[in-house]
Amino acid sequence: MIDVVIRAPLLSISGYGVHSRQVFKWLNERQDVNLHAQIVQWGNTSWMINSEYENGLVGEVMKASSNAETGKSDISFQIQLPDEWDPNLAKKNIGISAVVETDKCSSAWIDSINKMDAVIIPSEHVKQTILNSGHVTTDLFVIPEWYFEEIERNETTALESEKICL
């Protein structure tokens, strides 16, 4: 079993909250993962507190909530702003962030990026902005923030395929 901690605004009603729950769901469905959740605030957003929300996923998040001991987990996924990441949370640490919505990135965030083992970002634009903002020593992986789960499960009848451009 892989011991995994996810630190993220998992109960937040926000874009980062949605993305956090997508990552949580993926990890929670894996048979080889022992998952712990560290739920953090995202700005001044409201929280989902009904365990039935999102087909029971909110309840699964609540059950996984714990304070995993720093440095004990095999891997962490931290869905936060770069200066909020903890490079010592687990043996391997993956930062996930939208980072910027402009063409400039803070040098302090470049320093935070370089302390992680890898960073997942949502677009080539963000990747180029980071690379143009300083010397980056950490691998950057572009993974879009959202996808149709029906496509992953090959449930094409659940979607109007003519409306999906792949």
Predicted regions and their residues:
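Short hydrophobic/aromatic-enriched beta-strand-loop microsegments
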Residues: I94-G95, T137-P144
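Conserved donor-binding/catalytic core segment of Leloir-type glycosyltransferases
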Residues: V5, A158-L166
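N-terminal pre-catalytic "stem/leader" segment of glycosyltransferase-like enzymes
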Residues: M1-S73
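Structural alpha-beta junctions
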Residues: L27-H36, D117-E124, V136-D139
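Extended catalytic core of nucleotide-activated donor transferases of GT-like folds
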Residues: V5, T45-L131
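Short beta-strand->alpha-helix junction loop in the catalytic core
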Residues: V142-R153
